[in-house]
Amino acid sequence: LIVMSSCILLGYPVAYFLARYAGRFKYAILLMLIIPLFMSYIIKIYMMRSILGYSGLINKILKMLGIIEKPLEFFLWNQNSVIITLVIILLPLIIIPTFTSLDKIPSNIIEASFDLGCKPFQAFKYVIFPIGFPGLVVGSIFVFILALGDFVTPQLVGGTSGFTFGK
């Protein structure tokens, strides 16, 4: 549930931005989200392992900036690393269906809500979110099922403390 809720919190704003404001770069950004889905799952996990590791990219940057003196253990071989890895790997699976449902909303419906006196938050709450909700549900189901049954990620980045139901 933590992975699914994190994906919703991170993915919905991205999907909304792509659907409403991305302009001519919309499909280029969407393509960048789709391309990692064609990569091997194991390769993505090893990539995350090299980013989150003790000598990984995050720890190197933090040491270079002088924020830390020794590598943080927060990023690898614990439950946090499993959650971070699953969120990053599964994020496109919630962005794409949510984007699709939000992109199909005609702009004249949103304009009509403004003409009828809705403020931007009210238009989002009563028009945009209910129409785009089915895409969010589909993406949430994808993420929940894949995160629930994943057993490779806890083995490769979680160490002995990484736990999911699949393991």
Task: Give each language-model segment a name.
Residues 15-20, 50-54, 60, 64, ...:
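Transmembrane helix-loop junction
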